[in-house]
Amino acid sequence: MSLKSKLTKIQKLWLYYFPCDRILAKRICKSTVNTTVAFIFCLIPKITAHLGAAPAMLPMISVIVHPGRRVGGTIHGAIYCITGLIFGLAYAIFGRFLAQRCLGSSWHELTEAQQHVLHYKRYEAGLAILAVFEVIMLFFHGWMRSVSHYYFGIVFPLFVVVHFAFMDPLNETAGTIAKAYSTPFYLGIAMSIFWNLVLFPEWGTTYLGNTTIDAMNELHKSIDYSINFFIAVDPHNSSQLYSRDPVSLGKLLKMKSLISSKVNNCRVVLHECIYEFTYAYVSPTKLKPIISTLENLTVFINGLVNTCQLEFILLARHDNKLRPDDVAALTLPKNKEISFANAEKLLKVIDKLHPVIYSLHRTMSECMYIAKLVLAHAFDVKVSRVHSCSMFKDGNFPTFSNNANNLPNDVDIQNKINDLKQALEECKAKFKSEMLSFDIDIMSPSDEMFLLSSFLLNFRQTADSTLVIMESVKDILVKRQIQEKKGWLRGKRLWFLVLTNYETFSIWLKGDRNSVTENDTLKGTFNGNTNGFAHDTVIRRPDYEENELLSQKVSSNKNIVKDDASLDLPMTSEPKGNSSSTSDTSSSPLTLTKTTTFGTNRTSRRQGRFSFMSMLISIDKFCEVSHPHFRFGFQVAIALMLASFPMFIPKTRQWYIDYRGTWIGFVCILCLEPSVGGTFWVFFLRAVGVIFGAAWGYLSYVAAVNQTNPYLETVITVFGAIPGFYYLLGTPYVKAAIIEIISIYIVMLAAILPSQDDILTSFAKRCLAVGYGGGVALIVQVFFFPLKAREQLNEEISFVCGCISEMELLYATGLEGEQVASSMSEEKYKKIEKISKSAKEALARATAYKGLTRQEPRLKGEYTELENVFTQVIFIQKQIIERIDTISLLRKQNGSAVIEEFNSVVYPYRRQMVGSISCLMRALQEAFINKTPLPQFLPSARIAHRRLINKVRQTLRIRYPGQISNLSDKARKPNEGDYADGKDEDDDDNEGLVMKMNRRGQANTTANPHEYVLKEKFLSWNASSAASEEIIEYIEELLNLTKILVGVNEFKYGFLSRPLYEDWAAEAVTGFDNFINGKSNPMNTRRNRTPFDGTSIISEGNESLQSTNSNESQISPDSTRSYEPECPVAYEKNDNPAALNLLRIASHKAGQNADGLPKTFRNRAFSITSTSGQLSSLSRHSTLGNADPNYLNDDDESSDDDLPLALKMVLSHMKEKKD
């Protein structure tokens, strides 16, 4: 191996473990230069004389307010730091003033040692006042850090000023203290801003344009790839219109998380721009509507990708050669409803609609490309960043160079908008005309139609969102052209966005991201880029958030209180002295006057009691909401007072000062976290940082040979600061890196500046500070109100389950049969959007907690296996929330025909399905939070959803009986077992779940059913049904994973402990003669060892969509052992039981000429078994309401091969026992 190849290998290995891009390298360079210059200023005596009594604060503040971020982030950090300095300095001077008053008039004449000897009591009282002020400051510091991590940039400088000022001698004046803790701080902040603007400036507005273009590139690519994947079923077809083959499913699924992070980063950078002065033609706020549209576009693209995933399952592409990333990405449960749909029908429809979809896709892709070009020109982004689409064979996309200043003049935006509108209308018309050519069987509600509707609705909404983007781009282009006509000098303006409206001011004051940690605040960048490193701390979700978002009882109670408070007693008689206006006062509320003394006193007492009770309720609510703030406030106060109590005791104060007690408190405050983290791991990292920094400072000082060579000393410190800034800016270990960098300069300056300590003593005292201060912080955080990551993980997963239940209830409208004007109001959608955002943040926290749990000590065995289960749980919850977002936005945009027109008929079925889902999710929520097993019985949402689909299909047949019968004559004859067999009502009507339809007025309905089912609202319901099937399937999988984590309650004894009828059915088949004569011996059934062994026993042959006996298992959520039948058939007394062929029953083989088992016996045997996943295709087909005999290949209806698979399994078990 040559030297060059070895170096290349070493370089790749280095970049793998320590990734670094160009932006990070520039930021490290800026920060290192800034801190080095600050250290050089401390070495110059003339500059040090102007810095006051604490010149070592200059390098420290240069690290805290570092320039290694964008301009907006630096200004943001500077504003927060200055705010903390001002209030901290004022608070410290006030506390010292009161302490000096206790010393009397001699406070400025005597030293602290003399005060200790001459005025001990006064000196002790003054230190007691300082201690009280210190405790109040520490509690406020912890409270503010717990309220919002944004405020860490304010309260940390406040702590530094107050803590260090209280350590200074009490005989120093207020002017000396103000100079010591203002000049170096303000100089360090000014230097950071200077180097941020001079050396590699990063303007947020320019970065905003680049980020928006990058996000639109990914969105554009995802749209093209997903549409190509869906309609290009046969990539080898010569009539294929695309020049590229479809990408793999794995790559398509990975794009969802990528586009989500890109769009979120756009919003973050937009909020960061409010701190900047921008000199440009167009204000950055012009991108706000585009970014909002991109967020909605992300939801529709996720819907497109999900439909591609369903199509992949339906077309059974697993029979073909799969790419490795396809196999890795397709981690789906086996019992997918879509796998039982008819692929031929879907392919037939796609083949018809292929040209229509392609035409709109091509126009939409071209408009997206033009929009990116215009935005790149408007915000001075290099045109080379814009990616064009080259997957169209007849595509003619223009390309431009970077110096194309006349770019907008070559593009007619309005013409492109008109083309897109026309293409959208043509797509709707052609789609309607093409679909009208099919028979009603294809148009009826089915899994194929659900899949197609989901794709078409998301596709159209994507085109509508592109149209909205084009309108916004047109306004930006017009604004840019107007400003350009004024010339370069007058055209550009200075934009400052912080005080433009209340929203930007609120963001500036409080921030807009609840998931920001203190590390992100110190780092100054909120894009979550940690270069592959895991977070060491996570922000904890406020306890009151769950009550605000998920507690329906609280909101209802508020309404009750409000209503009760507004009730007034009616007047029964007219008060004295008010003889006039009788008609007015007779109907008015009771008015109490001064003459009614008794009533006034009674009312005043009631009002007093009500006010007192209201005050108690408010206090109780405040304490409940502020519980985590109290907890961390007490933690900070206890830890810091344990670490620094000697500074407030007269006898130990001087000793504590000599041992650098301020360092102990400084290390202790940085080791305390209001977040959940690996406490021992974080303490270890920060201890290593302090020791390494102090050792590097010692090395630098020794290399300078006792300050004889300060140049070499400075150069060596640079090599120690570079890795520190790398860990500060490029990894989540921010506070460990801060302590390491500060320790380098603090240890050196303690020996360089006039003091009694040499360099070795300073190194030892710094190590003592991390051992004592960090140890105290560790003890307090472990034993005083500890937070455990594994408990927080369960809480977050439980919270997400509650969010899903609440979103499902908000998504459902009209569950009581009432008439609703809109199926999704704006208010409900805003609530769903808010809950969805909180749930996604909770999932991000759960992912971090999952990694942190490995660092915690555990006594219950290894955590590795449980971590894999939690990984799957988080993934499934994310998929559920993603699909609820999609269907909610689709319903808001298009409505729902079933809710708005059929709700009076189908609402009991909708209510049962929604209630089942909500019940399941609430049961999971309580199981996770309480760590209790699941109950024995849980409702089946899958069956409820199938019944809803069947009822909608039946309602359509009742609404249009004549048209459907005419269309059905051309089609095949329905199967005998089909649900849609012409009956007006099914068996569930006898249970009172469905209301009879009023036949009056329906006979006059002559509308074409094709016209109805092609309405946008009905397509929206079809699309939501496809997503609802997926949601139910994921919920069942989540239920199974929950059983692994918390277990499930099972009946150990009694009738429900095992399926007794299974033994009866087995004996009826194997020993019919003995069974008839009453000589049967009950067999001992074997119970499953684990509730998840279903996949091991269902292994009789390969899976096939055309097979009559499907072997895929469907695990019902009702119990861990038994499986609920999908289609139980009641026993009919009119059937003739004499048609049994005992020979065939005993042989288990289908005869050629003999009659088989009667249909009633087979159905009855199926209904009494406890396995639903092992059904014949006839039963599955009957449930779905499809009646295609060619598709099912059910040639012999009475064949013995149609016996339930569960019955065959029992027979196989019996043979094994005999063997």
Swiss-Prot record:
UniProt subcellular location: Membrane
Ranges of Basic and acidic residues composition bias in the record: 969-982
Residue ranges that the UniProt entry lists as topological domain Extracellular: 58-74, 145-146, 205-629, 685-687, 731-732, 788-796
Spans through the membrane: 37-57, 75-95, 124-144, 147-167, 184-204, 630-650, 664-684, 688-705, 710-730, 733-753, 767-787, 797-817
Coiled coil ranges: none
Keywords annotated in UniProt: Membrane, Phosphoprotein, Transmembrane, Transmembrane helix
Positions bearing Phosphotyrosine: 1191
Disulfide bonds: none
Protein's UniProt keywords contain Phosphoprotein: yes
Residues covered by region (Disordered): 567-602, 967-990, 1096-1125
Phosphoserine modification, residue list: 1167, 1198-1199
Recorded topology in the membrane: Multi-pass membrane protein
Ranges of compositional bias, category Polar residues: 1096-1122
Comp. bias regions, Low complexity: 575-602
PANTHER family cross-referenced by the UniProt entry: 60S RIBOSOMAL PROTEIN L19, AFR661WP
General remark: Present with 1080 molecules/cell in log phase SD medium.
This protein's name: Uncharacterized membrane protein YGL140C
Annotated source species: Saccharomyces cerevisiae (strain ATCC 204508 / S288c) (Baker's yeast)
Lineage summary: Eukaryota, Fungi, Dikarya, Ascomycota, Saccharomycotina
